[in-house]
From Swiss-Prot:
Protein family per UniProt: Belongs to the RnpA family.
GO function terms (MF aspect): 3'-tRNA processing endoribonuclease activity; ribonuclease P activity; tRNA binding
EC number(s) on file: 3.1.26.5
Gene: rnpA
Main function: RNaseP catalyzes the removal of the 5'-leader sequence from pre-tRNA to produce the mature 5'-terminus. It can also cleave other RNA substrates such as 4.5S RNA. The protein component plays an auxiliary but essential role in vivo by binding to the 5'-leader sequence and broadening the substrate specificity of the ribozyme.
SUPFAM superfamilies with a match to the protein in the record: Ribosomal protein S5 domain 2-like
Pfam families listed in its UniProt record: Ribonuclease_P
Full protein name: Ribonuclease P protein component
Transmembrane segments: none
GO biological process, alphabetically ordered: tRNA 5'-leader removal
Swiss-Prot/TrEMBL catalytic activity: Endonucleolytic cleavage of RNA, removing 5'-extranucleotides from tRNA precursor
GO cellular-component term (any): ribonuclease P complex
């Protein structure tokens, strides 16, 4: 089962805005840029550099795993755009370790989504 089209992020203007955004999540194996959007659902894009992973098979495996984790953990997020950039070494992690990294990212995104106290 693939991620729904409404969760795909493809607009270059949004990519540029995400990269300029001050809201970031850094991990050893990935960087995530995020910001609120006007759509009522979360949207995500995964970027994997050819210089870090030469084989398309590896890049596709990473992309499938990341999308599976996002579908599982981002289900209760609202109105946020996320750009995930994968770094070297991500492929060597176990699936459970990858889930832990994305769980931390999801908690950070829920803080963004939560109403601010007055």
């Amino acid at each position: 089962m693939s991620a729904k089209t409404k969760h795909h992020l493809r607009d270059r203007k949004v990519f540029a805005a995400l990269l300029r955004s001050k809201r970031r999540f850094f991990s050893t194996f990935l960087m995530a840029y995020f910001m609120p959007n006007r759509v009522r659902t979360w949207r995500a894009a995964v970027s994997i550099s050819k210089t870090k992973y030469k084989l398309a098979v590896e890049r596709n495996l990473i992309r499938r795993q990341v999308k599976a984790i996002m579908r599982e953990q981002f289900c209760n997020l609202n109105a946020v755009d996320v750009l995930v950039i994968i770094n070297q070494g991500f492929l060597e992690l176990t699936f459970k370790e990858k889930q832990t990294i994305f769980l931390n990212l999801c908690q950070k995104l829920q803080e963004l989504d939560a109403p601010k106290p007055k």
